[in-house]
Amino acid sequence: MSDLDHVRWVGGGSGAGKTTLTRLLADRFGLDLYSTDAMIGAHSERLGATDAPLLERFRRMSMDERWVEHDPVTMYASFPWFHGEGFNLLIEDLRQMPTDRLVLIEGFRLLPDLVRPHVSNPSNAVWLVPTADFRRAAFKTRREADAFWMRTTDPAQALRNVLERDRLFSNKIVSDAARRGLEALHIDGQRTADSVATELALRFGLHR
């Protein structure tokens, strides 16, 4: 048993539709929804250099240093949220939420190795992994405020780097999930969001 058995976990790579799908589920079933992306700012303020050395280095980088000047392998290795920094704060937040109803948590910060100890039933967690084409299309349709690569001196190179970095991250998620007995669901755009949301609802045992 886990003290977080009332939580349903949706992790995965960027551009897979995690936010869209979990909002559909939250609206459909009246669930509390926790976005790990939305808490990055607040959690960053609580993390120091000792707790989060990768984050400390990331803070000091310019936009070009983050997204243009380094190769994707280095970008993956140096991105704090891909390596569990601040994950303990997510767990702290979840434990402060009501336990008498289901909570849906979503975001790329949910790493299989870190989530697994908090999951009694593997069906309560899933990782959404976009295909390369779906990821690229998702990034290119992001609103201007979210297109951080546009704030570099070479947006085209920055986007290429980010897409390759995220491919590496997605591959690691698939590998780690399989090793931990957890499921990764590939998203290729061939199904509607409603169809995928229905599959997730069945998986999570959600009922109106």
Segments predicted by a language model, with ranges:
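Hydrophobic anchor at the beta1->P-loop junction of P-loop NTPases
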Residues: 10
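P-loop (Walker A) phosphate-binding loop of NTP-binding proteins
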Residues: 13
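Conserved lysine of the Walker
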Residues: 18
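Hydrophobic positions on the alpha1 helix immediately C-terminal to the Walker A/P-loop
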Residues: 21
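Short beta-strand-centered segment that lines the nucleotide-binding/catalytic pocket of NTP-utilizing
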Residues: 29-47
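ATP-dependent small-molecule kinase phosphotransfer cores
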Residues: 42-102, 109
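A glycine- and Lys/Arg-enriched "phosphate-lid" helix/loop adjacent to the NTP-binding pocket
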Residues: 122-169
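NTP-dependent small-molecule kinase module
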Residues: 168-208
